[in-house]
Amino acid sequence: MTVSEKIFSKASGTPVKAGDFVLANIDLAMTHDITGPLAVQGFYEIMRDEEDKKVWDPSKIVIIFDHQVPADSINAAQNHIMLRKFAKEQGILNYDVYEGVCHQVLPEKGHVKPGDLIVGSDSHTCAYGSLGAFSTGIGSTDMAAVFATGKLWFRVPETFRFEVEGKLPERVYSKDLILHLIGDVGVEGVRYMAAEYAGSTIRSLSIPERMTMSNMAIEMGGKAGIIEADEVTEAYLKERIPGFKLDPYWKSDEGAKYLDIRYYDVSDLEPQVACPHNVDNVKPVSEVEGTKLDQIFMGSCTNGRFEDIKIMADIMGDEPVAKNLRLLVVPASKTEYMKLLKAGYIEKLVNAGAIVEAPCCGPCMGGSFGLLGPGEVGLATSNRNFKGREGSAESFVYLSSPATAGASALTGEITDPRKV
Protein backbone atom coordinates (compact mmCIF):
# COMPACT_ATOMS: atom_id res chain seq x y z
CA MET A 1 0.00 0.00 0.00
CA THR A 2 1.02 3.61 -0.48
CA VAL A 3 1.13 5.75 2.63
CA SER A 4 -1.98 7.55 1.39
CA GLU A 5 -3.86 4.24 1.10
CA LYS A 6 -2.73 3.36 4.62
CA ILE A 7 -4.03 6.64 6.01
CA PHE A 8 -7.43 6.21 4.34
CA SER A 9 -7.61 2.61 5.53
CA LYS A 10 -7.12 3.80 9.10
CA ALA A 11 -9.58 6.66 8.68
CA SER A 12 -12.31 4.47 7.17
CA GLY A 13 -11.73 1.41 9.34
CA THR A 14 -11.24 -0.97 6.42
CA PRO A 15 -8.45 -1.77 3.94
CA VAL A 16 -8.79 0.40 0.84
CA LYS A 17 -7.00 1.04 -2.43
CA ALA A 18 -6.81 3.90 -4.90
CA GLY A 19 -10.17 4.47 -6.58
CA ASP A 20 -12.28 3.29 -3.63
CA PHE A 21 -14.90 5.63 -2.21
CA VAL A 22 -14.78 5.90 1.57
CA LEU A 23 -16.47 7.73 4.42
CA ALA A 24 -13.46 8.75 6.48
CA ASN A 25 -13.04 9.96 10.04
CA ILE A 26 -11.23 13.29 10.21
CA ASP A 27 -8.35 13.73 12.67
CA LEU A 28 -8.13 17.53 12.42
CA ALA A 29 -10.19 20.25 10.73
CA MET A 30 -8.96 23.80 10.21
CA THR A 31 -10.73 26.90 8.98
CA HIS A 32 -9.76 30.56 8.81
CA ASP A 33 -11.22 34.04 8.70
CA ILE A 34 -12.08 33.98 4.98
CA THR A 35 -13.70 30.55 4.60
CA GLY A 36 -14.77 30.07 8.22
CA PRO A 37 -17.91 32.23 8.25
CA LEU A 38 -19.52 30.24 5.42
CA ALA A 39 -18.60 26.99 7.17
CA VAL A 40 -20.25 28.19 10.38
CA GLN A 41 -23.39 29.25 8.53
CA GLY A 42 -23.52 25.89 6.78
CA PHE A 43 -23.03 24.06 10.08
CA TYR A 44 -26.05 25.75 11.64
CA GLU A 45 -28.14 24.97 8.54
CA ILE A 46 -27.22 21.29 8.89
CA MET A 47 -28.02 21.38 12.62
CA ARG A 48 -31.19 23.49 12.38
CA ASP A 49 -33.46 20.64 13.55
CA GLU A 50 -31.09 19.51 16.30
CA GLU A 51 -31.68 20.67 19.86
CA ASP A 52 -27.99 20.45 20.77
CA LYS A 53 -26.18 22.38 18.05
CA LYS A 54 -22.66 21.30 18.95
CA VAL A 55 -19.74 20.36 16.72
CA TRP A 56 -18.72 16.71 16.65
CA ASP A 57 -15.45 17.19 18.59
CA PRO A 58 -14.16 20.69 19.47
CA SER A 59 -10.72 19.30 20.32
CA LYS A 60 -10.24 18.35 16.66
CA ILE A 61 -11.10 21.75 15.19
CA VAL A 62 -8.87 24.81 14.93
CA ILE A 63 -9.93 28.29 13.83
CA ILE A 64 -7.24 30.78 12.88
CA PHE A 65 -7.24 34.38 11.70
CA ASP A 66 -4.52 35.03 9.12
CA HIS A 67 -5.83 36.39 5.83
CA GLN A 68 -7.26 39.77 6.79
CA VAL A 69 -5.43 40.60 10.00
CA PRO A 70 -5.64 42.90 11.74
CA ALA A 71 -9.10 43.49 10.25
CA ASP A 72 -8.69 45.64 7.15
CA SER A 73 -12.39 46.28 6.60
CA ILE A 74 -15.62 46.36 8.57
CA ASN A 75 -16.64 43.11 6.90
CA ALA A 76 -13.40 41.45 8.03
CA ALA A 77 -13.95 42.71 11.59
CA GLN A 78 -17.48 41.28 11.56
CA ASN A 79 -16.14 37.92 10.37
CA HIS A 80 -13.63 37.91 13.23
CA ILE A 81 -16.36 38.71 15.76
CA MET A 82 -18.56 35.92 14.40
CA LEU A 83 -15.79 33.32 14.51
CA ARG A 84 -14.62 34.33 17.99
CA LYS A 85 -18.19 33.89 19.24
CA PHE A 86 -18.55 30.51 17.54
CA ALA A 87 -15.21 29.28 18.91
CA LYS A 88 -16.09 30.37 22.45
CA GLU A 89 -19.57 28.82 22.38
CA GLN A 90 -18.26 25.54 20.94
CA GLY A 91 -15.06 25.31 22.98
CA ILE A 92 -12.88 25.41 19.85
CA LEU A 93 -9.26 26.56 19.90
CA ASN A 94 -9.01 29.95 18.17
CA TYR A 95 -5.66 31.41 17.16
CA ASP A 96 -6.43 35.10 16.88
CA VAL A 97 -4.92 37.83 14.71
CA TYR A 98 -1.43 37.72 16.23
CA GLU A 99 -0.29 34.09 15.69
CA GLY A 100 0.40 33.91 11.97
CA VAL A 101 -0.48 31.88 8.90
CA CYS A 102 -2.49 28.70 9.44
CA HIS A 103 -0.11 26.41 7.54
CA GLN A 104 2.81 27.51 9.68
CA VAL A 105 1.02 27.76 13.02
CA LEU A 106 -0.62 24.33 13.03
CA PRO A 107 2.60 22.33 12.55
CA GLU A 108 4.65 24.47 14.94
CA LYS A 109 1.97 24.16 17.66
CA GLY A 110 1.97 20.36 17.42
CA HIS A 111 -1.39 19.81 15.73
CA VAL A 112 0.01 17.64 12.91
CA LYS A 113 1.53 14.16 13.03
CA PRO A 114 2.25 11.31 10.59
CA GLY A 115 -0.75 9.18 9.64
CA ASP A 116 -3.31 11.90 10.31
CA LEU A 117 -6.12 12.73 7.90
CA ILE A 118 -6.45 16.52 7.97
CA VAL A 119 -8.80 18.84 6.12
CA GLY A 120 -8.74 22.61 5.93
CA SER A 121 -10.91 25.10 4.11
CA ASP A 122 -7.87 26.46 2.31
CA SER A 123 -6.27 25.04 -0.82
CA HIS A 124 -2.75 24.96 0.62
CA THR A 125 -3.73 22.64 3.47
CA CYS A 126 -1.62 20.09 1.59
CA ALA A 127 1.36 21.71 3.40
CA TYR A 128 0.99 19.31 6.35
CA GLY A 129 2.06 16.42 4.16
CA SER A 130 5.58 17.59 4.96
CA LEU A 131 5.12 15.81 8.31
CA GLY A 132 3.68 12.61 6.88
CA ALA A 133 -0.01 13.46 7.16
CA PHE A 134 -2.56 13.26 4.36
CA SER A 135 -3.89 16.79 4.36
CA THR A 136 -6.08 18.42 1.77
CA GLY A 137 -8.14 21.49 1.11
CA ILE A 138 -11.94 21.40 1.07
CA GLY A 139 -14.72 23.94 0.57
CA SER A 140 -16.73 25.67 3.26
CA THR A 141 -19.78 23.45 2.64
CA ASP A 142 -17.73 20.30 3.19
CA MET A 143 -16.23 21.90 6.28
CA ALA A 144 -19.73 22.51 7.64
CA ALA A 145 -20.42 18.78 7.26
CA VAL A 146 -17.15 17.94 9.03
CA PHE A 147 -18.07 20.28 11.91
CA ALA A 148 -21.35 18.39 12.28
CA THR A 149 -20.22 14.79 11.76
CA GLY A 150 -16.43 14.52 11.85
CA LYS A 151 -16.60 12.56 8.61
CA LEU A 152 -16.21 13.23 4.90
CA TRP A 153 -16.50 11.27 1.66
CA PHE A 154 -13.34 10.76 -0.38
CA ARG A 155 -12.22 8.87 -3.43
CA VAL A 156 -8.90 7.37 -2.39
CA PRO A 157 -6.43 9.04 -4.75
CA GLU A 158 -3.85 7.47 -7.00
CA THR A 159 -0.26 8.36 -6.09
CA PHE A 160 2.23 10.10 -8.36
CA ARG A 161 5.74 9.57 -6.98
CA PHE A 162 8.59 12.01 -7.56
CA GLU A 163 11.99 10.34 -7.01
CA VAL A 164 14.58 13.09 -6.61
CA GLU A 165 18.31 12.37 -6.35
CA GLY A 166 21.43 14.51 -6.16
CA LYS A 167 22.67 17.37 -4.01
CA LEU A 168 21.09 20.75 -4.65
CA PRO A 169 23.74 23.19 -5.93
CA GLU A 170 24.76 26.25 -3.93
CA ARG A 171 21.97 28.83 -3.63
CA VAL A 172 19.43 26.43 -5.12
CA TYR A 173 16.68 25.41 -2.71
CA SER A 174 13.50 23.37 -2.37
CA LYS A 175 11.47 26.24 -3.86
CA ASP A 176 13.51 25.92 -7.05
CA LEU A 177 12.94 22.18 -6.97
CA ILE A 178 9.16 22.34 -6.57
CA LEU A 179 8.90 24.99 -9.28
CA HIS A 180 10.93 22.70 -11.54
CA LEU A 181 8.58 19.78 -10.85
CA ILE A 182 5.49 21.91 -11.47
CA GLY A 183 6.98 23.21 -14.68
CA ASP A 184 7.64 19.64 -15.78
CA VAL A 185 4.23 18.06 -15.09
CA GLY A 186 2.02 21.16 -15.47
CA VAL A 187 -0.77 22.63 -13.38
CA GLU A 188 -2.97 19.54 -13.89
CA GLY A 189 -0.17 16.99 -13.92
CA VAL A 190 -1.23 15.28 -10.70
CA ARG A 191 -4.88 16.33 -10.57
CA TYR A 192 -6.67 14.57 -7.69
CA MET A 193 -3.58 12.50 -6.95
CA ALA A 194 -1.31 12.31 -3.95
CA ALA A 195 2.06 13.77 -4.91
CA GLU A 196 4.61 11.68 -3.03
CA TYR A 197 8.09 13.19 -2.80
CA ALA A 198 10.94 10.73 -2.24
CA GLY A 199 14.63 10.13 -2.86
CA SER A 200 17.91 11.23 -1.28
CA THR A 201 17.34 14.91 -2.10
CA ILE A 202 14.02 14.97 -0.28
CA ARG A 203 15.46 13.13 2.72
CA SER A 204 18.20 15.77 2.98
CA LEU A 205 15.69 18.63 3.28
CA SER A 206 14.87 20.34 6.56
CA ILE A 207 11.25 20.51 7.71
CA PRO A 208 10.88 24.13 6.49
CA GLU A 209 12.17 23.06 3.08
CA ARG A 210 9.78 20.10 3.05
CA MET A 211 6.91 22.42 3.94
CA THR A 212 7.64 24.39 0.78
CA MET A 213 7.46 21.19 -1.28
CA SER A 214 4.19 19.94 0.19
CA ASN A 215 2.60 23.40 0.22
CA MET A 216 2.80 23.69 -3.56
CA ALA A 217 1.45 20.24 -4.48
CA ILE A 218 -1.89 21.88 -5.20
CA GLU A 219 -0.21 23.98 -7.90
CA MET A 220 0.06 20.85 -10.05
CA GLY A 221 -3.44 19.72 -9.11
CA GLY A 222 -2.42 17.49 -6.22
CA LYS A 223 -4.93 16.34 -3.62
CA ALA A 224 -2.01 16.11 -1.20
CA GLY A 225 1.77 16.46 -1.15
CA ILE A 226 3.20 13.85 1.17
CA ILE A 227 6.73 13.13 2.38
CA GLU A 228 7.60 9.99 4.31
CA ALA A 229 8.16 10.72 7.99
CA ASP A 230 11.72 10.01 9.12
CA GLU A 231 14.21 10.97 11.83
CA VAL A 232 14.05 14.61 10.67
CA THR A 233 10.28 14.57 11.17
CA GLU A 234 10.68 12.86 14.53
CA ALA A 235 13.14 15.45 15.82
CA TYR A 236 10.80 18.28 14.78
CA LEU A 237 7.73 16.73 16.38
CA LYS A 238 9.45 15.70 19.61
CA GLU A 239 9.94 19.41 20.30
CA ARG A 240 6.21 20.01 19.85
CA ILE A 241 4.32 16.87 20.90
CA PRO A 242 5.23 15.48 24.34
CA GLY A 243 6.23 11.83 24.15
CA PHE A 244 6.04 11.65 20.36
CA LYS A 245 7.54 8.50 18.84
CA LEU A 246 7.82 7.84 15.14
CA ASP A 247 5.73 4.91 13.90
CA PRO A 248 7.57 3.29 10.96
CA TYR A 249 4.23 2.07 9.57
CA TRP A 250 3.47 5.44 8.00
CA LYS A 251 5.41 5.04 4.80
CA SER A 252 4.71 3.43 1.44
CA ASP A 253 5.44 -0.28 1.21
CA GLU A 254 7.95 -1.73 -1.19
CA GLY A 255 5.95 -2.79 -4.21
CA ALA A 256 3.23 -0.19 -3.62
CA LYS A 257 1.30 0.63 -6.78
CA TYR A 258 1.85 4.09 -8.28
CA LEU A 259 0.06 5.71 -11.18
CA ASP A 260 3.39 7.13 -12.30
CA ILE A 261 6.96 7.56 -11.06
CA ARG A 262 9.17 10.39 -12.33
CA TYR A 263 12.92 10.46 -11.73
CA TYR A 264 14.98 13.63 -11.37
CA ASP A 265 18.65 14.44 -10.81
CA VAL A 266 19.00 17.96 -9.40
CA SER A 267 22.80 18.11 -9.30
CA ASP A 268 22.83 20.75 -12.06
CA LEU A 269 19.52 22.46 -11.30
CA GLU A 270 19.71 26.24 -11.51
CA PRO A 271 17.42 28.72 -9.72
CA GLN A 272 13.90 28.62 -11.15
CA VAL A 273 11.32 31.37 -11.68
CA ALA A 274 7.60 30.97 -12.40
CA CYS A 275 6.59 33.67 -14.87
CA PRO A 276 3.20 35.37 -15.33
CA HIS A 277 0.48 34.28 -15.26
CA ASN A 278 0.73 30.57 -14.37
CA VAL A 279 2.75 28.64 -11.81
CA ASP A 280 3.81 26.09 -14.43
CA ASN A 281 5.26 28.79 -16.69
CA VAL A 282 8.66 28.04 -15.18
CA LYS A 283 11.99 29.16 -16.60
CA PRO A 284 15.59 29.09 -15.38
CA VAL A 285 16.54 32.41 -13.81
CA SER A 286 19.05 32.93 -16.63
CA GLU A 287 16.14 33.39 -19.06
CA VAL A 288 14.44 36.17 -17.07
CA GLU A 289 17.43 37.97 -15.55
CA GLY A 290 17.17 41.73 -15.83
CA THR A 291 13.38 41.93 -15.54
CA LYS A 292 12.70 45.22 -13.73
CA LEU A 293 10.79 44.99 -10.46
CA ASP A 294 8.58 47.39 -8.52
CA GLN A 295 8.09 45.17 -5.47
CA ILE A 296 9.36 42.01 -3.80
CA PHE A 297 7.15 40.11 -1.37
CA MET A 298 9.14 37.88 0.97
CA GLY A 299 6.86 35.67 3.04
CA SER A 300 3.73 33.47 2.88
CA CYS A 301 3.07 29.92 4.06
CA THR A 302 5.41 28.77 1.29
CA ASN A 303 8.56 30.69 2.25
CA GLY A 304 7.96 32.89 5.29
CA ARG A 305 9.91 30.96 7.90
CA PHE A 306 13.08 31.96 9.77
CA GLU A 307 15.23 29.82 7.50
CA ASP A 308 13.78 31.46 4.37
CA ILE A 309 14.11 35.05 5.52
CA LYS A 310 17.62 34.36 6.84
CA ILE A 311 18.66 33.15 3.38
CA MET A 312 17.41 36.38 1.83
CA ALA A 313 18.94 38.62 4.50
CA ASP A 314 22.32 36.87 4.38
CA ILE A 315 22.50 37.37 0.62
CA MET A 316 21.66 41.05 1.04
CA GLY A 317 24.35 41.46 3.69
CA ASP A 318 24.68 45.09 4.75
CA GLU A 319 23.59 46.48 1.39
CA PRO A 320 20.43 48.58 1.03
CA VAL A 321 17.29 47.70 -0.89
CA ALA A 322 17.58 48.93 -4.48
CA LYS A 323 16.28 52.41 -5.22
CA ASN A 324 12.63 52.58 -6.31
CA LEU A 325 12.00 49.02 -5.12
CA ARG A 326 9.58 48.08 -2.33
CA LEU A 327 10.66 45.07 -0.25
CA LEU A 328 7.86 43.67 1.91
CA VAL A 329 8.87 41.06 4.49
CA VAL A 330 6.07 39.17 6.25
CA PRO A 331 7.12 36.32 8.60
CA ALA A 332 4.79 33.31 8.60
CA SER A 333 4.17 33.26 12.35
CA LYS A 334 4.83 35.05 15.60
CA THR A 335 7.28 32.30 16.54
CA GLU A 336 9.26 32.80 13.33
CA TYR A 337 9.09 36.59 13.76
CA MET A 338 10.55 36.35 17.26
CA LYS A 339 13.39 34.11 16.07
CA LEU A 340 14.23 36.68 13.40
CA LEU A 341 13.99 39.49 15.94
CA LYS A 342 16.30 37.80 18.43
CA ALA A 343 18.82 36.96 15.70
CA GLY A 344 18.92 40.60 14.59
CA TYR A 345 17.44 40.06 11.14
CA ILE A 346 14.41 42.32 11.63
CA GLU A 347 16.62 45.28 12.54
CA LYS A 348 18.97 44.46 9.67
CA LEU A 349 16.14 44.37 7.13
CA VAL A 350 14.49 47.55 8.41
CA ASN A 351 17.82 49.37 8.23
CA ALA A 352 18.21 48.13 4.66
CA GLY A 353 14.90 49.73 3.72
CA ALA A 354 12.53 46.77 3.95
CA ILE A 355 8.98 47.05 5.25
CA VAL A 356 8.54 44.33 7.88
CA GLU A 357 4.93 43.47 8.70
CA ALA A 358 3.32 41.41 11.45
CA PRO A 359 2.77 37.70 10.68
CA CYS A 360 -0.11 37.10 8.26
CA CYS A 361 -0.85 36.12 4.66
CA GLY A 362 -0.04 39.65 3.51
CA PRO A 363 -0.19 40.41 -0.22
CA CYS A 364 -0.46 36.73 -1.19
CA MET A 365 -4.27 36.69 -1.43
CA GLY A 366 -4.49 40.12 -3.06
CA GLY A 367 -7.06 41.41 -0.61
CA SER A 368 -5.06 43.24 2.01
CA PHE A 369 -1.95 45.46 2.01
CA GLY A 370 1.02 45.58 -0.34
CA LEU A 371 -0.93 45.21 -3.56
CA LEU A 372 0.46 45.80 -7.04
CA GLY A 373 -0.98 48.50 -9.26
CA PRO A 374 -1.65 48.38 -13.02
CA GLY A 375 1.52 47.71 -14.98
CA GLU A 376 3.61 46.98 -11.88
CA VAL A 377 5.88 43.95 -11.70
CA GLY A 378 6.38 41.94 -8.52
CA LEU A 379 8.58 39.06 -7.43
CA ALA A 380 7.20 36.90 -4.63
CA THR A 381 8.27 33.87 -2.62
CA SER A 382 4.62 32.84 -2.36
CA ASN A 383 2.81 30.11 -4.26
CA ARG A 384 0.58 31.68 -6.92
CA ASN A 385 1.00 34.21 -9.70
CA PHE A 386 -2.40 34.15 -11.38
CA LYS A 387 -3.56 37.35 -13.04
CA GLY A 388 -4.72 39.70 -10.28
CA ARG A 389 -3.49 37.42 -7.50
CA GLU A 390 -1.50 40.16 -5.73
CA GLY A 391 -3.41 43.22 -6.86
CA SER A 392 -4.35 44.64 -10.24
CA ALA A 393 -5.25 42.25 -13.05
CA GLU A 394 -2.89 44.38 -15.11
CA SER A 395 0.11 43.63 -12.87
CA PHE A 396 2.68 40.85 -13.31
CA VAL A 397 3.92 38.43 -10.64
CA TYR A 398 6.99 36.20 -10.80
CA LEU A 399 7.64 33.49 -8.18
CA SER A 400 11.07 32.55 -6.88
CA SER A 401 13.09 31.23 -3.97
CA PRO A 402 14.17 33.44 -1.05
CA ALA A 403 17.71 33.42 -2.47
CA THR A 404 16.58 34.85 -5.79
CA ALA A 405 14.43 37.37 -3.91
CA GLY A 406 17.43 38.46 -1.85
CA ALA A 407 19.67 38.94 -4.86
CA SER A 408 16.94 40.80 -6.71
CA ALA A 409 16.33 43.11 -3.74
CA LEU A 410 19.86 44.44 -4.20
CA THR A 411 19.50 45.19 -7.90
CA GLY A 412 15.82 46.03 -8.43
CA GLU A 413 15.57 43.39 -11.15
CA ILE A 414 15.38 39.60 -11.28
CA THR A 415 18.91 38.46 -10.45
CA ASP A 416 20.65 35.09 -10.29
CA PRO A 417 21.56 34.58 -6.60
CA ARG A 418 24.72 32.73 -7.63
CA LYS A 419 26.11 35.96 -9.07
CA VAL A 420 25.98 38.16 -5.96
From Swiss-Prot:
Gene3D superfamilies registered for this protein in UniProt: Aconitase, domain 3
Cofactor(s), by name: [4Fe-4S] cluster
Record's keyword annotation contains Phosphoprotein: no
Keyword Nucleus: no
Catalysed reactions, semicolon-separated: (2R,3S)-3-isopropylmalate = (2S)-2-isopropylmalate
A GO MF label: 3-isopropylmalate dehydratase activity
Enzyme Commission (EC) number: 4.2.1.33
Domain of life: Archaea
Co-factor binding details: Binds 1 [4Fe-4S] cluster per subunit.
Keywords, ordered alphabetically: 4Fe-4S, Amino-acid biosynthesis, Branched-chain amino acid biosynthesis, Iron, Iron-sulfur, Leucine biosynthesis, Lyase, Metal-binding
Pathway membership, UniProt: Amino-acid biosynthesis; L-leucine biosynthesis; L-leucine from 3-methyl-2-oxobutanoate: step 2/4
Record-listed [4Fe-4S] cluster binding positions: 301, 361, 364
Disulfide feature: none
Biological role: Catalyzes the isomerization between 2-isopropylmalate and 3-isopropylmalate, via the formation of 2-isopropylmaleate.
Family the UniProt entry places it in: Belongs to the aconitase/IPM isomerase family. LeuC type 2 subfamily.
HAMAP family, sorted: LeuC_type2
Subunit structure: Heterodimer of LeuC and LeuD.
Name the record gives this protein: Probable 3-isopropylmalate dehydratase large subunit
